[in-house]
Amino acid sequence: MKQLTILGSTGSIGCSTLDVVRHNPDSFRVIALVAGKNVARMAEQCLEFSPRYAVMDDTSSAEQLKIMLQQHGSRTEVLSGQQAACEMAALDEVGHVMAAIVGAAGLLPTLAAIRAGKTILLANKESLVTCGRLFMDEVKRSNARLLPVDSEHNAIFQSLPQSIQHNLGYADLEQNGVTSILLTGSGGPFRETPMCDLAAMTPDQACRHPNWSMGRKISVDSATMMNKGLEYIEARWLFNASARQMEVLIHPQSVIHSMVRYQDGSVLAQLGEPDMRTPIAHTMAWPNRVTSGAQPLDFCKLSALTFSAPDYQRYPCLKLAMEAFEQGQAATTALNAANEITVAAFLAQQIRFTDIAGLNLAVLERMDLQEPASVEDVLQVDAIAREVARKQVIRLSR
């Protein structure tokens, strides 16, 4: 039986992870749950899965949780703060850590899991977007293992030869017969919206993803295709891919989750219903397979599968992310931080949808970027970029 810590248990990925556990009670045991401030959901999870530990972001939330659990006779020990989250990621009895805390808050707990030599089920994009080389070097040094949870990266992982799977981030794609990686994306809810109408799109419209059920921040990132840009950066690190070895395709149906092109003309693809439980279950059970709870793909009900190249005028955030990778880790860190602020401002109706890309670019142009040599350096770049972004939002929304 595999013992799990789930970082970000009350979020979308965390809840889907627990659903896979629910379908496979004899295969997985939840040792620790870590979350932000959603006390009610954490209480439900603790009462159902009886983890040894539960960690909340702050003492107030932890106290509320403690009272709720005591009322139900739960023996789960309640802790709070980032240090406690890092300790849960490095517990001796835990072998697998689901890293699903969104944003920069997930960096240190994920790094703690890596340094403890765990198998990390990586759903936190920011880990590689902001700390790609630092994290990949630490994975090798600590003999940890990264398994990608993102549906696209998981699809690529499944389509790669074992020689690359077992040397992720360092294997030479060309020497293993790989020509290129094809990263697919739906194009989001505004794929066919006239360009002149994009400025008027509302947060609720942006969050109506045509295929996937996701949180509001990542739904907006899908609408701008910043999500695909961050995935591009992540894929470059995970698969040791050069720019010429990466292709990005719009695939509106979200049936083919990504592909790998080989030197002999073969293309291997991973297909499935758009359900995050599939890649989650794959990483949890790898190299074996377990039931995910997802519906099987019915080929007889499929419509045509279509593909097109991305329009960078429609999706400037995608191009911005690709260019940031070439500038270095400081640029990708600053872009990610700025985007979190601008998306939050859009969701709060402080700026227009079309302002997101322009503000992100403005932050990059206003920063003197020095390459980070440590996680502390990364966090400093992150903090500065957020402050610059906040000032840009205030200036624009006056």
From Swiss-Prot:
Task: Give the family from UniProt.
Answer: Belongs to the DXR family.
Catalyzed reaction equations: 2-C-methyl-D-erythritol 4-phosphate + NADP(+) = 1-deoxy-D-xylulose 5-phosphate + NADPH + H(+)
GO molecular-function annotation terms? Answer: 1-deoxy-D-xylulose-5-phosphate reductoisomerase activity; manganese ion binding; NADPH binding
Detail which positions bind 1-deoxy-D-xylulose 5-phosphate: K125, S151, E152, S186, H209, S222, N227, K228, E231
Needed co-factor(s): Mg(2+); Mn(2+)
EC number annotated for this UniProt entry? 1.1.1.267
Which positions does UniProt annotate for Mn(2+) binding? D150, E152, E231
Question: Organism's domain of life?
Answer: Bacteria
Q: Where does NADPH bind?
A: T10, G11, S12, I13, G36, K37, N38, N124, E126, G215
- According to UniProt, the name of this protein is 1-deoxy-D-xylulose 5-phosphate reductoisomerase
Functional summary from the UniProt entry: Catalyzes the NADPH-dependent rearrangement and reduction of 1-deoxy-D-xylulose-5-phosphate (DXP) to 2-C-methyl-D-erythritol 4-phosphate (MEP).
Q: Which species does the entry assign this protein to?
A: Salmonella typhimurium (strain LT2 / SGSC1412 / ATCC 700720)
- Read off the Pfam families from this record: DXP_redisom_C, DXP_reductoisom, DXPR_C
Query: What HAMAP family does the record point to?
Result: DXP_reductoisom (MF_00183)
Give the UniProt keywords, A-Z. Isoprene biosynthesis, Manganese, Metal-binding, NADP, Oxidoreductase
